[in-house]
Amino acid sequence: MTSRALLLLASALLGTPGLTFSGLNPESYDLATAHLSDGEQFCQGLTQEDLQGDLLTERERQGIACWSCRKILQKLEDLVGEQPNEATINEAASRVCRNLGLLRGACKKIMRTCLRLISRDILAGKKPQEVCVDIKLCKHKAGLI
């Protein structure tokens, strides 16, 4: 009786190679009856792998933050004009975020948290890239001091 049970078990395992170690049950292994099982277990691995390709690396995330900062500060510099002073910078800062679309939220946060440093840098004649380095949204580039 015991040998018969072992033989039955062995034939079941050999009939579905890899099934024992995959964590799948026979219903999800057979595509014709896969809809009868939970199904989430089968798709979960695919979903996780597919999403991993869409996740941003730290380097990409920093690049996006730096690009956004430069765009925002370039717009601010354009609004401030040729002869910046504290009043023109504050006036421009209050208007700069209005027409930036997707960058509006980031713009508001930058203006709220960093305006004092941004003002100081603009008054010192620094360019948007340099200001973004100072507020730590960009890294130093080669040749930029």
Curated annotation (Swiss-Prot):
Matching PROSITE patterns: SAP_B
Main location: secreted
Any GO BP annotation: killing of cells of another organism
Keywords of the record: Antibiotic, Antimicrobial, Disulfide bond, Secreted, Signal
One cellular component term from this protein's GO annotations in UniProt: extracellular region
Domain Saposin B-type intervals: 62-142
Pfam families in UniProt: SapB_2 (PF03489)
Domain of life: Eukaryota
InterPro entries: Granulysin-like (IPR038847), SapB_2 (IPR008138), Saposin-like (IPR011001), SaposinB_dom (IPR008139)
Propeptide segment residues: 23-62, 141-145
Signal peptide start and end residues: 1-22
Covalent S-S links between cysteines: C66-C138, C69-C132, C97-C107
Localization terms from the record: Secreted
Role summary: May be an effector molecule of cytotoxic activity. Has antimicrobial activity.
Protein's UniProt name: Antimicrobial peptide NK-lysin
Gene: NKL
